[in-house]
């Protein structure tokens, strides 16, 4: 997978309950959104900052 491939993945919150605020790219809207990540598992469509999300997936 390339870095851009993660932009196509749906956000997965994972099964844990840490409630970490992260950003994920929403391919349907074409925007990065703030979401809650559980802290374990999930996939690569998860970014610590909006800037990281935008830099990876903007204009995708």
From Swiss-Prot:
Chain residues in the propeptide: 1-2
Disulphide-bonded residues: 7-57, 16-40, 32-53
Subcellular location: Secreted
CDD domains given in the database record: Kunitz-type
Chief site of localization: secreted
Residues annotated as domain BPTI/Kunitz inhibitor: 7-57
Gene3D superfamilies: Pancreatic trypsin inhibitor Kunitz domain
GO cellular component, one term: extracellular space
Molecular function, one GO term: toxin activity
Site (Reactive bond for chymotrypsin): 17-18
Keyword annotations from UniProtKB, A to Z: Disulfide bond, Protease inhibitor, Secreted, Serine protease inhibitor, Toxin
Superkingdom, taxonomy of origin: Eukaryota
Tissue-by-tissue expression: Expressed by the venom duct.
The record's note on its domains: The cysteine framework is IX (C-C-C-C-C-C).
Family statement drawn from the similarity comment of this UniProt entry: Belongs to the venom Kunitz-type family.
Protein name (database record): Kunitz-type serine protease inhibitor conotoxin Cal9.1b
Organism: Californiconus californicus
């Amino acid at each position: 997978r390339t870095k851009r491939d993660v932009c196509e993945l749906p956000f997965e919150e994972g099964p844990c309950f840490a409630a970490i605020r992260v950003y994920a790219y929403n391919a349907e809207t074409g925007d990065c959104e703030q979401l809650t990540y559980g802290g374990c598992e999930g996939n690569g469509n998860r970014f610590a900052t909006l800037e990281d999300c935008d830099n990876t997936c903007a204009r995708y």
